[in-house]
Amino acid sequence: YADQIDKAIRRAESAGSALASNLPIGGTAVGTGINTHPEFGAKVAQRLTEALGISFAEADNHFEAQATRDCVVEASGFLRTVAVSFTKIANDLRWMGSGPRGGLFEIALPAVQPGSSIMPGKVNPVICESAMMVACRVQGNDLAIALGGTGGVGSLLELNVAMPMMADALLDSIGLLSATADMLVDRCLMGLEPNVPVIAVSYTHLTLPTKQAV
């Protein structure tokens, strides 16, 4: 899980690089740059870099950068992969925390709300399930962004008219994933405890056939 998160962090950083290195400014309407100072885009990128501490670069081809938003589609793809990683981890935690009587119950999830009155001891895995719902939303945003970059929907000849929708969906995904990462750590992982007696029994049962074979 830790390595999966490390790779997710690198993917998120790659998403930012994909956007910052292809700034479509200075190309005016369709990428010609007509009636604009030839250094306008580069100077804006430099000022943004100085102000935000992020390395920005003017697009090397304004026709491509303004007719398509492939870098946004690429960045969203990285975020979609992060969302899939969140789903895997959250779902595993949900199953390992199921119980106490009818599930695995290998870990004790922290209770963040009242449990069920008809199932004593059961902790509802609401934090895990919240993370999974966010992941579904991010994957939906990714589809919307992909459609926005598709010819006939957003990309029309020299222009892409779906940039507002693509930007809104991308920012939504970034905010959701960021908040969900904090929520998983603070409300789930920090209070998670291994159920040692149950794990010991499971380990004994799993290794019994091996011992018998020996």
Where are these predicted regions, by residue range?
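Short, mixed-charge aromatic SLiMs
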Residues: I107-I118, S155-A162, I199-Y203
